[in-house]
């Protein structure tokens, strides 16, 4: 397994693979890898000749009061996981490699970024789309793999790739959970013992909403009320948003008539966690 830090060096390797007509599966990450990332890597390994994992904590997708400076980093642990799952190449550039000069060009995807995390984290998806555009151009992958836990990100990236004619297939992979139901996340590392226990309220509230939907409830306000009521029973939980949106357009719906995304963002103490599920009538 190679660990490469420069765009020049990684492009030389990519060119060699392309000359040999090898397919490339790409898993973009910010590091501090866990079983959720591993599931993406395994899928990429199954479907491609070569697998690349990028590890880059992207500064332009963090807001001024967000956790960029303290975001967990552990390249040794990450490298071990990648080696275990037979990754061919880790691309781990420095910030100065990706952004050697002040950046004036940005990529925006309208409409899909108006709600959910796009509304609560201004500029976040502009940063995500911009860095992914750079990575797609540098690495030229055949397929790229994203977790469904970041459902809005997955929808935004799919639309960006469609609109800008990137010759890349975007693959969504299911949410991976702890045994007790908490969605795997690098930010779970921030939680103390009591907060970790309290964080289970996210999945519990979504399960109650799913039960109501499966029982025939079609009013999105009622579904939202079920989730809010459950979350409010947890003292350490502070709701950022609870949204029921169309799973394709990500626009709010009142009456549930087709495929929906039920998505929540909740602060447990100071840690912001997200979770979701999709439901089809």
From Swiss-Prot:
Catalytic activity reported: (R)-pantoate + beta-alanine + ATP = (R)-pantothenate + AMP + diphosphate + H(+)
Predominant subcellular localization, coarse grouping: cytoplasm
InterPro entries in the cross-refs: Cyt_trans-like (IPR004821), Pantoate_ligase (IPR003721), Pantoate_ligase_C (IPR042176), Rossmann-like_a/b/a_fold (IPR014729)
List of residues binding (R)-pantoate: 61, 153
SUPFAM superfamilies noted in UniProt: Nucleotidylyl transferase
Binding site for beta-alanine: 61
GO molecular function annotation: ATP binding; pantoate-beta-alanine ligase activity
Note: The reaction proceeds by a bi uni uni bi ping pong mechanism.
Protein's name according to its UniProt entry: Pantothenate synthetase
């Amino acid at each position: 397994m190679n660990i490469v830090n420069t765009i020049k060096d990684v492009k030389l390797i990519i060119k060699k693979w392309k000359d040999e007509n090898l397919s490339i599966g790409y898993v973009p990450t910010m590091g501090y890898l866990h079983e959720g990332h591993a599931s993406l890597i395994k899928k990429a390994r199954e479907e491609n000749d070569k697998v690349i994992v990028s590890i880059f904590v992207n500064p332009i997708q963090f807001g001024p009061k967000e956790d960029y400076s303290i975001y967990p980093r552990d390249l040794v642990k990450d490298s071990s996981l990648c080696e275990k799952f037979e990754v061919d190449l880790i691309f781990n550039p420095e910030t100065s490699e990706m952004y050697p000069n002040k950046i004036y060009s940005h990529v925006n995807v309208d409409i899909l970024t108006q709600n959910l995390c796009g509304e609560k984290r201004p500029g976040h998806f502009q940063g995500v789309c911009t860095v992914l555009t750079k990575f797609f151009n540098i690495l030229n992958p055949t397929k790229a793999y994203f977790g469904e836990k970041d459902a809005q990100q997955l929808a935004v990236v799919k639309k960006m790739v469609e609109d800008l004619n990137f010759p890349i297939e975007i693959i969504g992979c299911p949410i991976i959970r702890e045994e007790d139901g908490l969605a795997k996340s690098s930010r779970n590392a921030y939680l103390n013992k009591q907060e970790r226990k309290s964080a289970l309220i996210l999945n519990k509230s979504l399960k109650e909403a799913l039960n109501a939907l499966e029982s025939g409830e079609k009013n999105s306000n009622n579904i939202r009320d079920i989730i809010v009521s459950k979350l409010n029973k947890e003292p350490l939980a502070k709701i950022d948003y609870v949204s029921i949106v169309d799973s394709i357009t990500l626009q709010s719906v009142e009456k549930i008539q087709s495929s929906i995304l039920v998505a929540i963002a909740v602060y447990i103490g100071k840690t912001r966690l997200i979770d979701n599920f999709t439901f089809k009538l």
